[in-house]
């Protein structure tokens, strides 16, 4: 589960008797920028580096769908490519009503036409042989 101090379209306030969580980055010493500001920076980078793909490491459950939604909310309507490990859970979110626009598996990506696509993948894929097929990618931190 992702936690956020920002209220968005996927925010749900749930009543519970006991709440147990692990929140490594929930301590007050961690100060996180606002999502919309980070998405704006990403989209500015896509425009500035329009000949390079952007590889973004995200977790399959929650973070991937959050980034997809934030990109769409910011007006990005191009195809967003997903690593195969992100497809199944994202398809489930879509079946439950999350509108994320057009996404495709990276296996459908024509590398010869690769320019300024946004490609989401698990963080571990950023450093394995899968990512080597993308020439000179931009790898922003999310």
Question: Model regions: which residues?
Answer:
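Short internal beta-strands
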Residues: 20, 78-89
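Short, charged, surface-exposed secondary-structure boundary motifs
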Residues: 5-7, 29-31, 88-95, 114
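The feature marks the mature, well-folded catalytic cores of soluble enzymes
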Residues: 39, 54, 78-81, 96-97, ...
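C-terminal regulatory/interaction regions
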Residues: 73, 95-97, 105-142
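Residue-level preference for the first positions of well-ordered beta-strands
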Residues: 18, 51-55, 79, 116-119, ...
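Short, surface-exposed basic-aromatic patches at helix termini and helix-loop junctions that form
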Residues: 69-78
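A short acidic (Asp/Glu
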Residues: 65-70, 92-93, 131
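His/Asp/Glu-rich metal-coordinating catalytic cores
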Residues: 1-53, 57-62, 73
